[in-house]
Design a protein with these regions (language model features):
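Alpha-helix C-terminal capping/helix-to-coil transition sites in glycosyltransferase folds
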Residues: 71-73
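Phosphate-binding/catalytic loops
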Residues: 76, 82-131
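Functionally engaged cysteine thiol sites
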Residues: 8, 13, 81-87
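Conserved active-site segments centered on acidic
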Residues: 1-67
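Short alpha-helix boundary/capping motifs
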Residues: 50, 79-80
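Structural motif
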Residues: 68-69, 86
Length: 131
């Protein structure tokens, strides 16, 4: 199983949704985790609502730091716009998905970020499948 860690600043929006999509679409190919460089402690209610709209329940998830997930090394570490604030985590391959933080966006714009994350997770799965 391919291990992947999604990292953003608060682990309350982008990385949570990426982990959720990896679980939804991964068909057991991925072991996904998510964390934040400065976790907020909670998942944004907007993210919970946005993911509920596509059939995933984030309501029981919580925001966590890198120290709360397995130490790796991971096959993939995907950072999401946290720049220099992203902690170093050992990985075979690293990528930065420069995605805007949707935290304060209106639902239509928030959902655009959600949909972009889903698209990128699906592309990552295609890479893993092509392996």
């Amino acid at each position: 199983m391919t291990t992947v860690l999604f990292v953003c600043t608060e682990n309350s929006n982008r990385s949570q949704m990426a982990e959720a999509f990896a679980r939804m679409h991964g068909d057991g190919l991925l072991e996904p985790h998510s964390a934040g460089s400065r976790p907020s402690g909670t998942v944004n209610p907007r993210a919970v609502k946005a993911m509920a709209e596509v059939g995933y329940d984030l309501s029981t998830h919580h925001s966590k730091s890198v120290s709360e997930v397995p130490t790796g090394p991971y096959e993939f570490v995907i950072t999401m716009g946290c720049g220099d604030a992203c902690p170093f985590v050992p990985a075979v391959e690293r990528d930065d998905w420069d995605l805007a933080d949707p935290r304060d966006l209106a639902p239509p714009e928030f959902n655009q970020v959600r949909d972009e994350i889903e698209s990128r997770v699906k592309a990552l799965l295609e890479r893993v499948n092509a392996g």
